[in-house]
Amino acid sequence: MKIVISPAKSLDFEKTLPNNQFTKPAYLKQSKEIVSVLNKLNPKELSELMHISDNLAQLNWQRNKNFTTPFTTQNARPAIYTFNGEVYNGLDSYSIAEEKLAVLQNKLRILSGQYGILKPLDLMQAYRLEMGTHLPINEHKNLYSFWKEIVTNDLNKELKNNELFVNLASNEYFSVIDTKKLKVPIITPEFKDYKDEKLKIISFFAKKARGLMVRYIIDNDIETLDGLKGFNYEGYSFDANLSKGNTLVFTR
């Protein structure tokens, strides 16, 4: 099984790491190309490009200037212990037992505007670059064009025939994958909560549930569709009536 998730805007470079394991990202050459383009922009231009405040633009301008290779444990940090949004709160990577890290590293992939695709223990430096940012890179009109073939080929190399491929990423990030060229079907879980007596996708809860499902898969080393349907963390359960085809709906 392979799982893809989105990155997070919020980053944590302060918390003490639970172990000293790390790997190197596969596409640093491409990341350097992107940063070299970003480094031609001043903070005001970054603010306009990314639709962010002047303060955030200044911070990310400095991050781009600080980008340096090779990545080491002194200047970078494993992605899974750095991203810090709701998905990652649900996953709670710091409490994953060290003997489960190999399962996590094998199954999970993080899509990224700056790094393309990351394994959990891949080192990363601080950045902010959403996949939907309209940033031309050389002959590519945007980041989707720049990364699509690279990310799709990377996944296809790893995916075995009949292996489950689980999409727990947002549409913004999942769109970087050329799904027509993927050699396996895509399983897309959805998470709905009752609100005002109606079932709805509530963004805050749905994001956390994506992380919870990753954690469920890792905890139980899930490999099958039936195993996936058994997801029951924090009150969710599979709803066969609402599910259709490869879209699995979980409600609570």
UniProtKB/Swiss-Prot annotation:
Family stated for the protein in its record: Belongs to the UPF0246 family.
GO cellular component, one term: cytosol
Cited NCBIfam families: PRK02101.1-3
Native organism taxonomy: Bacteria, Pseudomonadati, Bacteroidota, Flavobacteriia, Flavobacteriales
Gene Ontology BP terms: response to hydroperoxide
Top-level taxon of origin: Bacteria
Listed name of the protein: UPF0246 protein FP0718
PANTHER family, alphabetized: PEROXIDE STRESS RESISTANCE PROTEIN YAAA (PTHR30283:SF4), PEROXIDE STRESS RESPONSE PROTEIN YAAA (PTHR30283)
InterPro entries: YaaA (IPR005583)
Organism: Flavobacterium psychrophilum (strain ATCC 49511 / DSM 21280 / CIP 103535 / JIP02/86)
